[in-house]
């Protein structure tokens, strides 16, 4: 069975590690955890490095623990933050925890010998009293030690509340609790979590005289220098209600050539050899972008499932060429309807409207005069066929699957009409 550290290093997924981790992994599989902040009801692609690390841990024989911060979520981690986060209610956090667990099921198995486990740190943090916490945790850390952490130093000028200042002690207590209760010996997280992770290892060492380990992932930025996972529209979410599967697919498909090798290593389970073969194919015919297509299909299928991915891929082909519209299913056209301008008409309305009326209705033309000029220049089409006259009408037999008609202006402007 592959060694976890070797697997992660081969994919450039390790930024830092505590001494002795390699020796510990050589002894056999390990139980490890990653913490997730439950301030939203969905993970986003910025969380996927952590999620993939848990998946690799399980593939290498280890037992992954997902710690959802129901307790720490009520405090707020200052790491990488310029201001204090809003405090959520217990009810909000519980709803978010349930939603996040459902998303993680796409990546790790909750069945079998080394089944993944979900833990909410509120279960143990709510049970400990202040005096007990100060006695059992606080006495093991000096204020100087806590002030030296980058997550704290970065906030000293702007101000940091005692609530956030104490966060590293609470996360340290998580690590100690999991070590005691579940023999968890590894915590993983982003590079900004290094201070919190080492605080936990320090607490375990001081209280139990044992060695536990930490591993962090690199900060992921794109070749253009922007933070990975951010678009003009904001974060790219795993929840289809927040980011549609089509937009999710397009996010990965639009990966810069300079980033695609790294993202294939980070976010797929393709072997290093398979990735090299994809890149060689891409070098022979860059226009087809096989590496980006495989990346987009692989990640979308894992997050949204293979059926949704097939519909999304087909919808993408409709807009960018390479498919027969008549063969498109109603599901595929429904995906498109959520991504391009659309209008719904009744059968009676369709019979009364010309194609020019429909083009104006969906916003592809400002007026019938614009349609006439566009038709003269062969600039409009209906279901892939160049429009010869704006006065034509769409018959029932002209409709695509599901009662759709696809209108097009130029090469890249589309709209759908749905007949109900």
From Swiss-Prot:
UniProt-listed HAMAP family: Tyr_tRNA_synth_type1
GO cellular component labels: cytosol
Upper lineage: Bacteria, Pseudomonadati, Myxococcota, Myxococcia, Myxococcales
Catalytic activity: tRNA(Tyr) + L-tyrosine + ATP = L-tyrosyl-tRNA(Tyr) + AMP + diphosphate + H(+)
Alphabetical list of SUPFAM superfamilies matching this protein: Alpha-L RNA-binding motif (SSF55174), Nucleotidylyl transferase (SSF52374)
Binding-site residues, L-tyrosine: 33, 167, 171
Compartments in which it is found: Cytoplasm
Family: Belongs to the class-I aminoacyl-tRNA synthetase family. TyrS type 1 subfamily.
Organism per entry: Anaeromyxobacter dehalogenans (strain 2CP-1 / ATCC BAA-258)
Protein name: Tyrosine--tRNA ligase
CDD domains: TyrRS_core
């Amino acid at each position: 069975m592959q060694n976890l550290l070797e697997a992660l290093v081969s994919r450039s997924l390790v930024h830092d590690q505590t001494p002795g981790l390699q020796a510990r992994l050589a002894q056999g599989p390990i139980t490890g955890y990653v913490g997730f902040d439950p301030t939203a009801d969905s993970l986003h692609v910025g969380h996927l490095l952590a999620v993939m690390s848990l998946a690799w841990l399980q593939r290498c024989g280890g037992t992954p623990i997902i710690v959802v911060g129901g307790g720490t979520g009520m405090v707020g981690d200052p790491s990488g933050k310029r201001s204090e986060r809003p405090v959520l209610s217990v009810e909000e956090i519980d709803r978010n925890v349930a939603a996040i667990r459902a998303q993680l099921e796409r990546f790790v198995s909750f069945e079998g010998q080394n089944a993944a486990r979900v833990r909410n740190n509120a279960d143990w943090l709510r049970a400990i009293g202040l005096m007990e916490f100060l006695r059992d945790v606080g006495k093991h850390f000096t204020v100087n030690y806590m002030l030296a952490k980058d997550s704290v130093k970065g906030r000293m000028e702007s101000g940091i509340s005692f609530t956030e200042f104490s966060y590293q002690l609470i996360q340290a207590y998580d690590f100690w609790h999991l070590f005691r209760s579940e023999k968890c010996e590894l915590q993983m997280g982003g590079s900004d979590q290094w201070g919190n992770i080492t605080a936990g290892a320090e607490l375990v060492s001081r209280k139990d005289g044992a060695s536990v380990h930490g591993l962090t992932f690199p900060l992921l930025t794109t070749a253009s220098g922007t933070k990975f996972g951010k678009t003009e529209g904001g974060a790219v979410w795993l929840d289809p209600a927040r980011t549609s599967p089509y937009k999710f697919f397009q996010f990965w498909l639009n990966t810069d050539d300079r980033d695609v090798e790294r993202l294939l290593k980070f976010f797929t389970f393709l072997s290093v050899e398979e990735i090299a073969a994809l890149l060689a194919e891409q070098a022979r015919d860059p226009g087809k972008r096989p590496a980006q297509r495989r990346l987009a299909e692989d990640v979308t299928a894992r997050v949204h499932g293979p059926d949704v991915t097939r519909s999304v891929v087909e919808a993408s082909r409709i807009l960018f060429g390479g498919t027969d519209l008549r063969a498109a299913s109603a599901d595929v056209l429904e995906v498109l309807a959520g991504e391009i301008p659309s209008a719904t008409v009744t059968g009676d309305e369709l019979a009364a409207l010309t194609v020019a009326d429909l083009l104006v209705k969906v916003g592809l033309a400002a007026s019938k005069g614009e349609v006439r000029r566009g038709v003269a220049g062969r600039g409009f089409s209906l279901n892939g066929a160049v429009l010869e006259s704006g006065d034509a009408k769409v018959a029932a037999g002209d409709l695509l699957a599901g009662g759709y008609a696809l209108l097009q202006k130029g090469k890249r402007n589309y709209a759908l009409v749905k007949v109900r």
